[in-house]
Amino acid sequence: MYKRQWYSQKIRGEKIYENKTPSEIKKVFRLEEKNKQCKPEDVLSHLDKNLLKYSNFNPSPNYYGYITGSGNQIGVIGEFLKSALNQNNLKWHSAPANTEIEKICIDWISKFIGYYNKKNAGVFVSGGSVANLMNIAIIRKIKGHDSINKDGIYGNKTMRIYVSKESHSSIDKAMDILGLGINNLVKIEVDDEFKLQPKLLREKIREDLN
């Protein structure tokens, strides 16, 4: 009940973080090393006193202008269940309920964006940056030579990825991580509505093919 009251009061407040320096925050959490074991309740008490105080309060309506979502109270229950069950979506038998829920949600999203067909498949990942990395890795696998998984990209024709000039920086990083090279990421100009211009895209592809 106490935490619920704290949450309700905090979400109505204006302050979303403590204006402290890195050294000040570090000092709070640098517990003295002891030879004896630390009781779990002591650790929880310390976190209760300090972790909540010195963490950014993302659920606040005053927290905006950055990439993280606000979260919500029902999400706390979801995170609790996820940690308690500790499922591994390695294969169906290791996480049957999670696997079917994931497939259903992917179907929902596919229908929502108008990209649905019975053969649709996919997985949920931690966020957009990892999704971009995975997508480009899949493209590399499909478009690369047959032995790319064994011999790597050496001897393969240069691959290029075309994106809008407003694309996320994670795509640049993915090109670097996957060995495709940032110089092979071609960024196409956008119009006044920040939309990629198909005409310029076609022209650039023709230019590269020639």
Predicted regions and their residues:
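N-terminal entrance/gating region of PLP-dependent enzymes' catalytic architecture
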Residues: 1-119
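PLP-dependent aspartate aminotransferase-fold enzymes
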Residues: 68-82, 89-209
